[in-house]
Amino acid sequence: MNRILSRAQMRAFDRHAIDACGVPGVVLMENAGRGATDVLEREVLGGDARGRRVVVVAGLGNNGGDGFVLARHLLLRGADVRVLVVGDPARFVGDARVNVDAFSALGRSFETVVLREPLERALADADAIVDALFGTGLDRPIAGLFASVVEAINAASAPKLALDIPSGLDADTGQPLGVAVRADVTVTFAHRKLGLCTPRGAELAGRIVVADIGVPGSLLGEETAAFTFDAADAARAIRPRPSGAHKSSAGDVLIFAGSPGKVGASLLVARGAMRAGAGLATIATFRDAAERLDARVLETMTATIDDADAAESLEDRVDALLARRNAVVIGPGFGTDAKARAVLARVLERYPGPIVVDADAITLAAREPELLAPARGRLVLTPHPGEA
């Protein structure tokens, strides 16, 4: 799993690297800019920067400093680099000023943007555009000349690389602060930022590449905003089976799912459980859905919740189904009527193991949050935006 950081966590990470580990800020900036150069050359320029026209649009903060590091490394790789600074260059300070001076020491100058039209002409000739205007620290809407610059970048036809985060994107919410750069590639430093993982943020960021800046992730301790979880993580989470393993030794999953018109939901869950390594999976559903289910399953078993002996109550039937299970899923396509509610309440009250609460079960819990209070097992809720 890879960590996802909020704006405050990334700021603390940088500060800890500087104060506790003795890594100067100028070194972090150098590593970030050099890593971004590698990404630009590989992902945008086809593996060779020589002779390519690159326009770097830089702000006055550390993101602009990263842009100057990138511009210097591009020059050393034979690119035709043009740096356009938005704002008064006299306001560069600290590590950013060091890298502005290092770029100038190569005998190259930069230009200052004061009007949109000259900027548009410069961008029209570019093979690639680097957005180094604002980084993760931006927390107010972009306006005035800066908004015009972002609009000009977006209107240009050349592919765009954003440094750390597209300028104008809120690093926490993933929403544009007024206007935001629409990048083709975003190279984000050290760790993904929370805003890049929202639907709108991911759309504006384009392809996201994480660049190492030479600081171990262990500096974060356990605190992080979120984690990524991909196919490789899932594969690592499945324990290797011993040579003598059989279906009863690999986990037994009970799935309360499916109703008329939504039988497919139960089949998808069962397929996922088996693919994740379960040895046994049983779909428990009501009689009217079970009749549509039996002919469609192969390795999954089925059980009918309301088709037991007439003397057996619904609660007793649920208890019998729960016996000796290793995990329970409840909710996909299950319905939200009184019977479904009664099953959910019983499962939460009686089952001590892990319970995935999904779909219709989340809807029921949202209507009556007190349903979750007596839960004995560890709950995993998986809402989509309409259920969250």
List the model feature ranges, each with a label.
Residues 1-86, 93, 185, 196-355, ...:
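Small-residue (G/A/S/T)-rich helix-start motifs and N-terminal tracts that mark the onset
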Residues 38-133, 141-163, 343, 351:
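Nucleotide and nucleotide-moiety/phosphate-recognizing core
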Residues 89, 118, 168, 288-289:
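Positions that flank functional sites
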Residues 100-107, 179-180, 200-203, 372-373:
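Short, conserved catalytic or adaptor-binding loops enriched in Gly and charged residues
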Residues 106-112, 137-142, 305-310, 332-336:
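Short, flexible loop segments at the rims of nucleotide/cofactor-binding pockets, characterized by
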Residues 115-118, 165-171, 194, 310, ...:
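Short acidic loop-to-helix transition motifs that present clustered carboxylates
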Residues 123-127, 153, 180, 322-323, ...:
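A short, aliphatic-rich alpha-helical micro-motif
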Residues 126-128, 133-225:
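Internal gly/pro-rich beta-alpha loop/helix module
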